[in-house]
Amino acid sequence: MTAVEATPITKEEQSKPLALRVGAELVGSFIICFAIYAICSLGSAVYGINMAFIALLTGIVYAAVTVIFGSISGAQFNPAVSVAAMLTGKTHVLDGILYIIAQVLGGIGAGAAIRFLLPTSEQVTFKIWMTPTVNGFDKNSVSYSTLGNYGVTLGITLAIAVEVVAGIIIVASALRTTDGHGESKTNHAVAMGLAYGNGTAITYPVTGAALNPARATGIAIFAQNQGLNEEPLQQLWVFWICPVLAAAVVALVVIVAGMIGTKKNVPDTVETIDEVEGNTVLGEASVADGNDGEQDEQSYAQANADESVESN
């Protein structure tokens, strides 16, 4: 075996270059956000697809893009997931910050593409496309046109509650299906598809299913000043605070659970050390007894020899 073959390859040596990983987060986020914007705008306005289809398609999009880029960057595609990965040590802080920047730029790029690709006219304004696409609450909720007629609005408290709960599901699924270095396990894509699909079903009637600060930011910028009931950028802070809060909660649970697990392993280690020391003492005692026995035999043989000499 050569020296090269005998040297194990470390995880750091196996990881992809940082530029490649950041590029994967950028392109992956662009594809995800563009697909979701298209589903919500074209699908809702033209075909009137319901929440079930939006939830299903959102989950499929995240799962598919995770399969494509999971082996490169770990397929985070969400600033909340990146924050949790940094807090738990799965991702280096510098890498995580660059991931977040790439994710937001991907969302903005997707928002720009949708803004300039969707057709408009005097009858079909950009507002019609954006109403089911932009994330918001109260008068900007996708349910406002229906519930508003009955004097009911879905306000900020409900928006925060559903976004935090959905964020916890997504972040926990991401951490559970990535290894200690943030790389995807075999079931990562399926888990993320299910998590985002479930999160969409929970949040879409209230907020339009932000779930991802990059997704909310990308479309909010280009929907600003387009005649919506409320300006999207004024409500955008909710869709950053809630996912990051969810990330912090999940990361705290993971860290505390790890500390508890470490403490439980300490007594086992002490017992093992005691057993080893005990076995060592017993072994030394056995060796000593064996040496004493040999010395007794030698003394007995010497005594017999002396008696034989005297007899002669």
Task: Annotate each predicted stretch with a short phrase.
Residues 1-312:
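Membrane-interface helix-loop junctions and terminal tails of multi-pass membrane proteins
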